[in-house]
C-alpha cells in the first residue's frame, strides 16, 4: 500500500505512534523483506521493535539482519530483546560479536559471549585519534577466536 514506505521510515526514526497509526490504515509491516524491524533495530528503537514483533514481523529475516545491525550500532537492549525472541547470535559467521567488537561495544560483546562459550574475544579496545580532523573513533579488534 501507499503506507508501506511510510511505516518503514517511521520505524527507522522510532515514531511508534506514527507506526501504530499507519498499521491501523493498512500499512504492511513486513514490506520490503521486514525492513521496518531491521531499521528499528539498527537505530535502537526498542519500543518499535517490540510492537512490530507482537504484530508478527520476522526478526530472523535476511540471516538475522536485525540483531547483526543492532550489535553493530551498540543497542544492547535491542540485542537482548531479539535474543529473547530467538535471534541467532552466530548468524553470518558471528557478525554480531565481531562487529560489536570492532565498534567498541564491549557490553554487547560481553553479553553475546555469555550466551555462547564457544566465542572467545581477546584484547578488544577502542582508540580515539588525537588528530583534530578525525571525529570518529578508530576501533581495533586484535584477536577473535570462534570455535
Swiss-Prot record:
**SMART domains registered for this protein in UniProt:** ANK (SM00248)
Q: Which domain of life is it from?
A: Viruses
* ANK repeat placement: 2-31, 32-61, 62-91, 93-121
Q: Name the chain's protein.
A: Putative ankyrin repeat protein R847
Concerning InterPro entries, the annotation shows: Ankyrin_rpt, Ankyrin_rpt-contain_sf
Q: Which residues form a coiled coil?
A: none
Tell me any Pfam family this protein matches. Answer: Ank_2
Keyword set includes Repeat? yes
In which organism is this protein found?
Acanthamoeba polyphaga mimivirus (APMV)
Keywords from the named record? ANK repeat, Repeat
Amino acid at each position: 500500500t501507499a503506507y508501506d514506505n511510510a511505516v518503514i521510515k517511521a520505524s527507522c526514526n522510532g515514531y511508534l505512534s506514527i507506526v501504530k497509526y499507519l498499521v491501523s490504515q493498512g500499512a504492511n509491516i513486513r514490506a520490503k523483506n521486514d525492513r521496518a524491524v531491521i531499521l528499528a533495530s539498527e537505530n535502537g528503537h526498542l519500543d518499535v521493535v517490540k510492537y512490530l514483533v507482537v504484530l508478527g514481523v520476522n526478526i530472523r529475516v535476511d540471516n538475522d539482519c536485525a540483531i547483526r545491525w543492532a550489535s553493530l550500532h551498540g543497542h544492547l537492549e535491542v540485542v537482548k530483546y531479539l535474543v529473547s525472541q530467538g535471534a541467532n547470535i552466530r548468524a553470518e559467521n558471528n557478525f554480531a560479536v565481531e562487529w560489536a567488537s570492532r565498534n567498541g561495544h564491549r557490553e554487547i560483546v560481553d553479553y553475546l559471549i555469555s550466551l555462547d562459550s564457544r566465542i572467545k574475544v581477546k584484547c578488544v579496545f577502542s582508540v580515539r585519534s588525537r588528530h583534530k580532523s578525525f571525529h570518529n573513533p578508530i576501533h581495533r579488534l586484535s584477536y577473535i577466536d570462534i570455535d
